[in-house]
Amino acid sequence: MTTIQKIYSRSIYDSRGNPTVEVELTTELGTFRSMVPSGASTGEWEAKELRDNDKNKWGGKGVTIAVHNVNNIIGPALVKSDIKITDQRGIDEFMIKLDGTNDKSKLGANSIVGVSMAVARAAAAFLKIPLYEYIGKLAGSKTTECIPVPSFNVLNGGRHAGGDLAFQEFMIMPIKAPTFSEGLRWGSEVYHTLKALAKKKYGASAGNVGDEGGIAPDLTTAEEALDLVNEAIKEAGYDGKVKIGFDVAASELYNGKLYDLDFKSEHPKPENKLDYKKLYEKYSALIEKYPIVFIEDPFSEEDWGAFSYMSSKTKVEVIADDLTVTNVKRLSKAIELKCANALLVKINQIGSLSETIDAANMAKKAGWGLMVSHRSGETDDSFIAHLAVGLEAGQMKSGAPCRSERLAKYNELLRIEDNLGDSAIYAGTRAADYIKSNTL
C-alpha cells in the first residue's frame, strides 16, 4: 500500500492571469499534479480561498501564503501521518481538522482542495483505474459510463462581461445529440454561427470573448441575448435539438429588497427594480417564448422563499449554486424547503473531494439533478471531467467551446467517451429527467 512521499506547491497563473495554486504529490509511482480554479461571482458561503491581500503584488491576489501552507504545514503533516494514499476521506478529514475552521480560512480552501485532487489522481494510479472510476467508487455510483451533456456558455453578461446585460451566462445544451462527441460538434457549430451573427448585427467587437469563452456583445436585455442565441441555433440547423439555459447569478442583482436588472447601467430605470414575484413572472415569460430547460441562481443566495416559490410553479430545472455552494448544510435546508431540483457542483466551493461527493450524493438521494461546473478563473486541469462522469452527473458546464482552459475539460470527456467505447452512454435527454417533458 503506497503512501505520500512528498507534497510540493507553487504559484502558477489561471486563465485571467491571476495567481493560483498548483500542487504536486509524489509517491513511489510518480508525481501527480493538480491546479486550482477560482471564481469571480462567488457565493457568500463558499469555503474561503486564501489570498495574500498584498496590494503591491498582483493587486492583492497573490497565493504565496496558500502555497506556503501546503509546503510547510499540510505537506509535512501528511507525509508524517503515514495515511495510505487510497484513504481519500481520511486524508481530506485530516486536512480539515488541521485547518480547524468551519470555512477553511486558516489554511485556505485553495490549498486543501489542491492536495485533495492530487491525492485522488495518485490513488487512481495506484489502483490502476481511471480517475473517473476511482471517484465513482468513492461515491458509490451505479455506473461510470455516463457522459454528461455539455452546457456551453456561449454569451456572457453580468460580472463576466462589460455592457449592461444583467444575466451572467447564456448557455446551450445539445440534449438531443446521439453522443457526446456529436454534442460537442453541435455546440461548436452553434457557437461559431452565433459569433458570426453577433458581428454582423453589432459590429466586429461583438465577437470578442469573455472570461469563459462566450461572446460579449453590448446587449441590454435578456430578450436580446436569447433572440440572438435562438437564431444561431436555428441557423446552425439544430432547432428543437439544442436547448437553452441561463445563469442569472441573481445575488449580484439583489439590493436586499429588490432585484435590479439595471445594476450595471449608468441610466437605471425604476421599472427594472423587481420583487421576486415580478422577477419570476419575467422568467415565466422567457420560458414560454424560448426553448429554455434550466435557470441557475434565479434569486439571491439568501432569498430562500423566492427559490421555493419558483420551484413550486415552474416547469424547468432550477439549479442552485450560490444558494447551496456544494455544502451539505446549505443543501439540506434547500432540500427541506424545496428550493430547487438540481445542484451545481464546484469542488473548490467546498474545498475537498470527499465533501463534494457528500453534497452530490445528498442531492441525488433527494431526486435532484447534478451539473458539475468549472470556475471563471480556470486552468488546463481536466479534473472536473472525471468528477462529472464519476458522480453520474447528467450535465457539465465548462464555458464555451473556445479557449484552451475550457476545451481541456470537453476534450477530456471526448477521451473518456473514446476509452469507454460502445459502453459509453450519453446522458442526452436523460440529463433532464427533472425537467417536465413538455420542455424537451
UniProtKB/Swiss-Prot annotation:
Gene Ontology MF terms in the entry: magnesium ion binding; phosphopyruvate hydratase activity
Pfam family, one: Enolase_C
InterPro entries: Enolase, Enolase-like_C_sf, Enolase-like_N, Enolase_C, Enolase_CS, Enolase_N
Name of encoding gene: eno102
Protein name per the record: Enolase 1-2
Reaction catalysis annotation: (2R)-2-phosphoglycerate = phosphoenolpyruvate + H2O
Compartmental location: Cytoplasm
GO biological process: canonical glycolysis; glycolytic process
Cofactor-binding details, from the entry: Mg(2+) is required for catalysis and for stabilizing the dimer.
Residues binding Mg(2+), per UniProt: 247, 296, 321
Pathway: Carbohydrate degradation; glycolysis; pyruvate from D-glyceraldehyde 3-phosphate: step 4/5
EC number: 4.2.1.11
Assembly information from the UniProt record: Homodimer.
Family: Belongs to the enolase family.
PANTHER family registered for this protein in UniProt: ENOLASE (PTHR11902:SF1)
Top-level taxonomy: Eukaryota, Fungi, Dikarya, Ascomycota, Taphrinomycotina
Keywords: Cytoplasm, Glycolysis, Lyase, Magnesium, Metal-binding
Positions of substrate binding: 160, 169, 296, 321, 373-376, 397
Primary localization class, coarse: cytoplasm
Gene Ontology cellular component annotations, sorted alphabetically: phosphopyruvate hydratase complex
Known cofactor(s): Mg(2+)
Active site, per annotation: 212, 346
